[in-house]
Amino acid sequence: MHIAAVGRALPDHFVDQETLIGAFRSAWAARHHNVARIEQLHRNAMVGGRHLALPAEAYLTLDFTSANEAFVRVATEVGGRAVMAALEAFGAAPTDVDAIWFTTVTGVAAPSIDARLVNRLGFRSDIKRTPIFGLGCVAGAAGVARAADYLVGHPDALVVLLSVELCSLTLQKDDLSIPNLVATGLFGDGAAAVVLTGASRSAVGPRIAASRSVFYPDTEDVMGWQVGSSGFRIVLSSEVPDMVRRHLRDDIRAFLADHGLGVPDIAAWVAHPGGPKVLEALQEELGLPRAALQRTWDSLAAVGNLSSSSVLFVLADTLADPPPPGGWGLLIAMGPGFCSELVLLQW
């Protein structure tokens, strides 16, 4: 199985981080005793700006209903652009696609967004669809792995993974908790699509050599949503960097060792930009220089954390500047559960 192409799409509305800091400062100054703390948390995210599903002023009056209506509309539009960008990069048409996986954690739709795209883009009526909700930030890597699992049994197939995350639409204006203050400075909106091909097709792009899912028991409270009348309220523990130190380091080493590899053998680190503390922990625990994760740092600075779409943005940048033939890569993400997903690639 191979990753043949990645397409990206971003909403048209872009706001730089300093402007967003000013907007949140104005909105929360009367209710938060330490406005400087809000500014500090947002600057610590090391994000330069973010794309938004809606014009900034529209968020002042959003409720759960209007936010989710916007999600369905915008997700269909940017998701369609991402899919077409990926297919065009590979030289395929929607009618060539045999199956599609769709993942999101920032809105709800039934029919799901992938179903709406069958009509909008002209997929075949016999396309196999798998919409996924709840994996959060890990879903980009997990989606690649699950699509590859499918291709083992369907070596002639061409499939698409689509991730759309419109994190801004989950804004909780009345939540002044530290997790929400961190989230409002970190997360942005975007979509990414991956074209994958089975082993019987002509090889294009890196080979998916193996994958591994790891679930950490009794960690449901590390990350996720508390869903209520106002929508999705974030659950985000300060333990996430510690999960890297306690678990992910050893999981990565064990996974690589099972394939006769070690950390020095990895030429391309395709890591989800979970935030500065998470990336610093990953670098420290694996003994990596910052340059090894530079694409991830650059993506974080450019567009923020796009949840499941982010690692696919980093993957797109890696495909544009790949390691030499035969070089190894490792796709890494963590998310609600708490869990991690590792995908071993070879160019």
Located regions from the model:
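Short beta-strand segments
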Residues: 5-7, 103, 133, 158-165, ...
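Active-site glycine-rich loop that binds ribose-phosphate moieties when present
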Residues: 125, 132, 142-146, 166-189
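Claisen-condensing/thiolase-fold acyl-transfer catalytic domains that form or cleave C-C bonds
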Residues: 105-107, 116-119, 124-126, 131-152, ...
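Short coil/turn connectors at secondary-structure junctions
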Residues: 94-98, 125-128, 153-159, 181-182, ...
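Short, well-ordered amphipathic alpha-helical segments that serve as non-catalytic structural scaffolds
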Residues: 43, 47, 74-90, 113, ...
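Conserved beta-ketoacyl condensing-enzyme motif
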Residues: 45-123, 129-134, 263-279
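Condensing-enzyme catalytic core mediating Claisen C-C bond formation in acyl metabolism
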Residues: 1-74, 173-246, 250, 254, ...
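Active-site-adjacent elements of ketosynthase-type condensing enzymes
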Residues: 109-116, 160-182, 210-229, 250, ...
